[in-house]
Amino acid sequence: MSHAVKIYDTCIGCTQCVRACPLDVLEMVPWDGCKASQIASSPRTEDCVGCKRCETACPTDFLSIRVYLGDETTRSMGLAY
């Protein structure tokens, strides 16, 4: 099951989320909106298993990357989102 992965413009281009993802769902792409001139992108969200390691690795106070679990997963885990 794929999950929605959202990258926000508060991304600082540090690559921590990309390196934390065990399934290579994320990659960095050019972007002029931050000092690093790159931003995380999620071209392979169909491979996301919802582990949220990318969220945990994000050093910004804003959680520049968020994984939104699909309905089926949240029900099976007993989570209310």
Swiss-Prot record:
Keyword set includes GTP-binding: no
Pfam families (alphabetical): Fer4_7
Domain spans labelled 4Fe-4S ferredoxin-type: 2-31, 39-68
Cofactor(s), names only, from the UniProt record: [4Fe-4S] cluster
Cofactor binding annotation: Binds 2 [4Fe-4S] clusters. Cluster 2 is most probably the spectroscopically characterized electron acceptor FA and cluster 1 is most probably FB.
Gene Ontology MF, one: oxidoreductase activity
Binding site residues for [4Fe-4S] cluster 1: C11, C14, C17, C58
Catalytic activity: reduced [plastocyanin] + hnu + oxidized [2Fe-2S]-[ferredoxin] = oxidized [plastocyanin] + reduced [2Fe-2S]-[ferredoxin]
GO terms under biological process: photosynthetic electron transport in photosystem I
Matching InterPro entries: 4Fe4S_Fe-S-bd, 4Fe4S_Fe_S_CS, PSI_iron-sulfur_center, PSI_PsaC
Assembly, per entry: The cyanobacterial PSI reaction center is composed of one copy each of PsaA,B,C,D,E,F,I,J,K,L,M and X, and forms trimeric complexes.
Principal localisation: membrane
Annotated binding of [4Fe-4S] cluster 2, by residue: C21, C48, C51, C54
Biological source species: Prochlorococcus marinus (strain NATL2A)
Cellular location(s): Cellular thylakoid membrane
GO CC annotations on file: photosystem I; plasma membrane-derived thylakoid membrane
Protein name: Photosystem I iron-sulfur center
Membrane topology per record: Peripheral membrane protein
Keywords assigned: 4Fe-4S, Electron transport, Iron, Iron-sulfur, Membrane, Metal-binding, Oxidoreductase, Photosynthesis, Photosystem I, Repeat, Thylakoid, Transport
